[in-house]
C-alpha cells in the first residue's frame, strides 16, 4: 500500500494495519522462504530546522467527526518515534534529506545548532544529505558541525554549553558540492550492510543538495564551491556504488515537489516542482528517492507516472512533525528489491494552544513518550536561552501571520518591510524610501500571548538568519525589473512566483496574463507614479542584496550602505510602534482579466 500523506488519521491507521498484517504473515524463523529475503526498514525525515521544542504544528486529519488537528513534532517525541520504528525493523537505516539545521528557533540557533546535532546524535541516524540551509553560516561552519571543535566562524560563540562540541556522529553527504580544486567538500555516498544468516545485503546512499543552493544563501557562505547537476551527479555515482557491492540504491536529495493527490490515492497525480525533471533523468535502477526542501508531505509511487522510473518518492514535510517509514524486501538470490512500501507517520507531540485555539492530543493517532535524554538536553539549552527568549519586546493587537492573499501579500511580510523602512528612513541611516522583504525569510507566524505581549524569542523565530540591512539607490526601471523577476527569473515562475513584500507607501499591479517584462504596472510611491529615470533608495536584506531568490537585479544599485541587523530593526519597530496591528494587505494588486 502506498500512502501519500499519513497526516490523515485514516492513513495513519492504514499504515499500522498494513504493518501488522505484514508481521503477522511473516514466515516461521528459519524457513526456506524467509532465508531467501532480507527485509530492511528505512526511516527518514527532512527540513527539521532545529525544531527541538514542539513547533506548534497542527496536522489535519479526517475522522467521523470531520477534520481534526493533531499536535505534532518535538525532538524528544521524534527520537521516540524513530526508536519504535527501529524496533519494527531489525535491519534499518535512518536518513534525512537536508536542512536539519539553520532557520532554527532560538533554543537551537543561539548555540549555532549544536544542540540539534547532539539531539540527532542520540537518535543514531546514519546519513544526512546537506540542504541549502546547511550553508547559511558558511561551509567552514558546516564542517565544524560534522567534525566538532570550537573554532569560531560566525558572529556567535561556539561551544557555549558543550565544551568541547563533539560534532555529528552521523555522516553528512554532499555529492554535488565540490571545491574549486575538484575535491568533494564532504563524502558523496555511504553504504550500510545487513547480514541475515549467510546473506549480506548492502544499501548504498547518495546525498546531495539542490543545484540552486548558491542562489539561496549568502555568496560568502559558498565561496570556493560549485554545485553540480543533481541527476548527472547521482547517475555517475550509481555504478560506483554497485562496484562497491550495493544491492539497493537510495538517493536523499534536498529538492522536492508538490502533489494534489488525495490522501489515500496510490499515485502522484499532479506532481510538479523542481524534483520532477531530476527524476526524469535519474538512473531507473534507483530504488528510493527521499526528498525535501518544499516542506511538503507525500509518498508517491513514481512508477505510476513514468513506468520506466519506478522509484518510491517520499518527503516528511517539515520540523519533525512527520516521519517516513520505507519497507524494502530484497531477494538474496537476485539481489533485487522485490517489494517496497512507504508510509508517513504523524509524530504526535504535546497539546498546545495556538491562534485557532486548543490543539489537544488525539487518541486516534499513536502517541510517543518523550525520550528522556533528548528531553533533558532540550531543557538544558532552553534554560540557557530562556532569559533572552522571554524578554518582552512589545505588544501586538492580533496575530501577525504569513497567510497570503490572492496577490500573495501577507500581513507579516508587510510588517517586516515596514520595520526595515523605519530603521533606515532617516538620512543618517541610509535615506530609504522603499523596502523589499522576501517571503522565504519569514520562518514563523507571530502570535502574541493572551496579554498581547510579544517576546524576543518569537521575533527570532520569524527572522533567524541574522541578515544585515542594505540600502542602495535604484532607478524606477530597475525597480520594475526587480518586480518582474518575481515571475521570470530562475525558479521564480508564473506557476511558482516569489512575490516580495513591500513597505507602506508603495503599491503596484501585476498581470500574469501579460508576457514577461510587461507584467508590472501602476507603480506608485508616496502618492506619485514611479518613473523609469527616477532614483529611489531601497532597503533589503543582505541576502537579497547578494541576488538571493533569483533577484539578480538587486545586486545592482548605487551608493551602497550597510545598516543594522534585520532582527534588531524588527525589535525596534515593536518598541516604538506598540501595540502593533496587522498591516492591511492592499499594497499589491493582482489583475485578473475578465473571462471572455
Regions found by a protein language model. Give the residues of each.
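Generic amphipathic alpha-helical segments used as scaffolds and interaction surfaces in large
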Residues: 65, 69, 129, 225, ...
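Acidic, metal/ion-coordinating pockets
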Residues: 25-353, 412-422, 435, 473, ...
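Alpha-helix initiation and N-capping motif
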Residues: 75, 113, 139, 275, ...
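Hard-cation-handling environments
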Residues: 337-454
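Feature captures C-terminal
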Residues: 36-41, 51, 160-191, 302-312, ...
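Bacterial N-terminal signal peptides
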Residues: 12-22
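Bacterial N-terminal signal peptides that target proteins for export
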Residues: 2-13
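Acidic/histidine-rich, surface-exposed loop or edge segments in extracytoplasmic proteins
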Residues: 49-66, 392-404, 463-465, 547-555
Amino acid at each position: 500500500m502506498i500512502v501519500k500523506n499519513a497526516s490523515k488519521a485514516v492513513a495513519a491507521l492504514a499504515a499500522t494495519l498494513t504493518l501488522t498484517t505484514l508481521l503477522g504473515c511473516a514466515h516461521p524463523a528459519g524457513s526456506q522462504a524467509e532465508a531467501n529475503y532480507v527485509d530492511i526498514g528505512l526511516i527518514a525525515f527532512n527540513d527539521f530546522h532545529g525544531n527541538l521544542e514542539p513547533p506548534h504544528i497542527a496536522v489535519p486529519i479526517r475522522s467521523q467527526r470531520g477534520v481534526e488537528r493533531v499536535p505534532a513534532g518535538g525532538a524528544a517525541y521524534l527520537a521516540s518515534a524513530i526508536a519504535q520504528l527501529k524496533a519494527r525493523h531489525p535491519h534499518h537505516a535512518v536518513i534525512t534529506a537536508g536542512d536539519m539545521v539553520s532557520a532554527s528557533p532560538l533554543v537551537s540557533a543561539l548555540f549555532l545548532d549544536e544542540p540539534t546535532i547532539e539531539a540527532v546524535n542520540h537518535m543514531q541516524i546514519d546519513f544526512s544529505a546537506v540542504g541549502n540551509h546547511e550553508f547559511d553560516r558558511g561551509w567552514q561552519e558546516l564542517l565544524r558541525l560534522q567534525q566538532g571543535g570550537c573554532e569560531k566562524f560566525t558572529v556567535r560563540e561556539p561551544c557555549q554549553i558543550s565544551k568541547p562540541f563533539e560534532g555529528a556522529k552521523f555522516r553528512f553527504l554532499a555529492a554535488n558540492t565540490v571545491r574549486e580544486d575538484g575535491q568533494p567538500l564532504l563524502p558523496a555516498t555511504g553504504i550500510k550492510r545487513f547480514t541475515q544468516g549467510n546473506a549480506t545485503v548492502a544499501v548504498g546512499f547518495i546525498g546531495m543538495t539542490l543545484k540552486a543552493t548558491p542562489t539561496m544563501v549568502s555568496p560568502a557562505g559558498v565561496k570556493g564551491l560549485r554545485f553540480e547537476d543533481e541527476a548527472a551527479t547521482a547517475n555517475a555515482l550509481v555504478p560506483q556504488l554497485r562496484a562497491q557491492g550495493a544491492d539497493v540504491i537510495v538517493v536523499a536529495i534536498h529538492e522536492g515537489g508538490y502533489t494534489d493527490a488525495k490522501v489515500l490515492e496510490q499515485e502522484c497525480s499532479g506532481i510538479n516542482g523542481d524534483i520532477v525533471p531530476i527524476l526524469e533523468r535519474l538512473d531507473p535502477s534507483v530504488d528510493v528517492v527521499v526528498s525535501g526542501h518544499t516542506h511538503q508531505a507525500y509518498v508517491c509511487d513514481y512508477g505510476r507516472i513514468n513506468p520506466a522510473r519506478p522509484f518510491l518518492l517520499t518527503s516528511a514535510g517539515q520540523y519533525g512533525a512527520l516521519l517516513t517509514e520505507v519497507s524494502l524486501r530484497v531477494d538474496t538470490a537476485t539481489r533485487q528489491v522485490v517489494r517496497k512500501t512507504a508510509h508517513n507517520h504523524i509524530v504526535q507531540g504535546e497539546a498546545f494552544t495556538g491562534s485557532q485555539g486548543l490543539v489537544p492530543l488525539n487518541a486516534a493517532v499513536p502517541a510517543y513518550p518523550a525520550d528522556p535524554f533528548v528531553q533533558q538536553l532540550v531543557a538544558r539549552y532552553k534554560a540557557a536561552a530562556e532569559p533572552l527568549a522571554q524578554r518582552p519586546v512589545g505588544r501586538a493587537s492580533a496575530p501577525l501571520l504569513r497567510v497570503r492573499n490572492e496577490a500573495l501579500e501577507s500581513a507579516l511580510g508587510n510588517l517586516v518591510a515596514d520595520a526595515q523602512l523605519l530603521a533606515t528612513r532617516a538620512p543618517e541611516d541610509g535615506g530609504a524610501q522603499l523596502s523589499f522583504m522576501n517571503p522565504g525569510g519569514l520562518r514563523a507566524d507571530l502570535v502574541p500571548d493572551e496579554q498581547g505581549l510579544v517576546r524576543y524569542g518569537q521575533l527570532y523565530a520569524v527572522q533567524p538568519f541574522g541578515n544585515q540591512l542594505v540600502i542602495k539607490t535604484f532607478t524606477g526601471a530597475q525597480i520594475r525589473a526587480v518586480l518582474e523577476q518575481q515571475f521570470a527569473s530562475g525558479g521564480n515562475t508564473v506557476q511558482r512566483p516569489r512575490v516580495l513584500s513591500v513597505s507602506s507607501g508603495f503599491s503596484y499591479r501585476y498581470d500574469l496574463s501579460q508576457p514577461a517584462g510587461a507584467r508590472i504596472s501602476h507603480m506608485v510611491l508616496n502618492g506619485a507614479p514611479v518613473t523609469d529615470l527616477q532614483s529611489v533608495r531601497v532597503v533589503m536584506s543582505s541576502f537579497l542584496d547578494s541576488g538571493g531568490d533569483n533577484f539578480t537585479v538587486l545586486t545592482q544599485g548605487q551608493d551602497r550602505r550597510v545598516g543594522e541587523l534585520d532582527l534588531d530593526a524588527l525589535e525596534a519597530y515593536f518598541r516604538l510602534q506598540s501595540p502593533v496591528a496587522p498591516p492591511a494587505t492592499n499594497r499589491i494588486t493582482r489583475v485578473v482579466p475578465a473571462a471572455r
